[in-house]
């Protein structure tokens, strides 16, 4: 099979994408005819490199690779590709839309606000949760870029600094209630959930360094949680996967509060596949090697 691995890109997650692309290539180049294309935003060059392949393996993260733009292009050119459809990618990338979908379907998610302003040295926000802990995050970026966590109400200068940090990666920002508790993620492959991973970062939270630097986080697979919680997490994940419109694979992130309440955080339609990535860890716990995982995704995408 002729496969083109599409990687790199021009988003803030370029470095992660390069690592994912290389890992995917190393796992399948001996059994398929594999080429690699480092996408630089030029769609004419992109088409020239993919027009004769059987499948494009999208190893991009963030930006056009994950917001539906690349997917829409491939759909218009009848090029087969891995990952979500254009519509599903667009829904998932916008954290506000994904949370609204969950809220509408009775899946708990932390309170959030989009309508906030900083004026004349004062913060004005409509939601009461802002007075306690909250997270400032870009609506449409991954890998924890631009995120600031406040476990208690910040000073005005701290808040301004966090907004500036978030706006370096996106103009669209949301404030989300901070949920004290455990970080859990569920990987979906086809119509099945894989073993749940608990993430325990060595730092204050699971930031970029914790995600992509070896030994900066501890991963417990499968997570040591009650069977009832496990079943509910898997049920929620499969439901979200389908509501968003994903088919082949996705990864859904949650918080489990101290009183064992589950909260949806976000869905990743093109999760990382680096050496430290969560999806391969989950698959390995289920007895699926990295190479087998990539080939399963390929088969689900043809």
Q: What are the language-model segments listed below?
A:
Residues 177, 186-188, 241-273, 283:
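Conserved metal-phosphate-binding beta-hairpin within the catalytic cores
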Residues 143, 202, 268-282:
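Glycine-rich phosphate/pyrophosphate-binding beta-alpha loops
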Residues 155-238, 256-263:
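Phosphate-binding site of ATP-dependent enzymes
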Residues 115, 147-153, 188-190, 257, ...:
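Short beta-strand-to-turn element immediately C-terminal to the catalytic PLP-Schiff-base lysine
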Residues 1-7, 50, 91-176, 180:
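Active-site nucleotide/adenylate-binding loops and adjacent lid/helix of ATP-dependent enzymes
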Residues 1-87, 91-93, 97, 116-125, ...:
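ATP-binding N-terminal substructure of ATP-dependent carboxylate-amine bond-forming enzymes
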Residues 34, 80-81, 109, 134, ...:
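Hydrophobic beta-strand scaffold residues
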């Amino acid at each position: 099979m002729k496969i083109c691995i599409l990687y790199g890109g021009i988003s803030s997650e370029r470095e992660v994408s390069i690592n994912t692309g290389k890992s995917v290539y190393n796992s399948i180049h001996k059994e398929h005819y594999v080429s690699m294309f480092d996408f630089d935003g030029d769609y004419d060059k992109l088409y020239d490199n993919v027009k004769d392949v059987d499948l494009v393996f999208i190893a991009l993260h963030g930006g056009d690779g994950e917001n539906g733009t690349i997917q829409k292009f491939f759909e218009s050119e009848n090029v087969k590709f891995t990952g979500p459809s254009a519509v599903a990618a667009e829904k998932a990338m916008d954290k506000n839309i994904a949370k609204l979908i969950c809220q509408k379907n009775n899946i708990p998610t932390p309170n959030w606000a989009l309508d906030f302003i900083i004026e004349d040295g004062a913060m004005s926000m409509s939601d009461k949760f802002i007075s306690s802990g909250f997270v400032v995050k870009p609506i449409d970026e991954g890998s924890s870029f631009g995120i600031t966590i406040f476990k208690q109400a910040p000073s005005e200068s701290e808040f301004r600094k966090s907004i500036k940090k978030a706006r370096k990666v996106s103009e669209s920002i949301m404030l989300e209630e901070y949920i004290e508790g455990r970080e859990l993620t569920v990987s979906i492959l086809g119509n099945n959930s894989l073993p749940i991973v608990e993430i325990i970062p060595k730092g204050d939270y699971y930031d970029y360094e914790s995600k992509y630097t070896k030994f900066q986080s501890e991963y417990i697979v499968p997570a040591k949680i009650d069977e009832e919680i496990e079943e509910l997490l898997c049920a929620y994940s499969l439901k979200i996967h389908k509501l968003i419109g994903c088919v082949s694979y996705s990864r859904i992130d949650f918080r489990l509060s101290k009183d064992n309440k589950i909260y949806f955080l976000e869905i990743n339609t093109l999760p990382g596949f680096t050496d430290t990535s969560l999806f391969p860890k989950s698959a390995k716990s289920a007895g699926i090697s990295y190479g087998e995982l990539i080939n399963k995704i390929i088969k689900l995408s043809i």
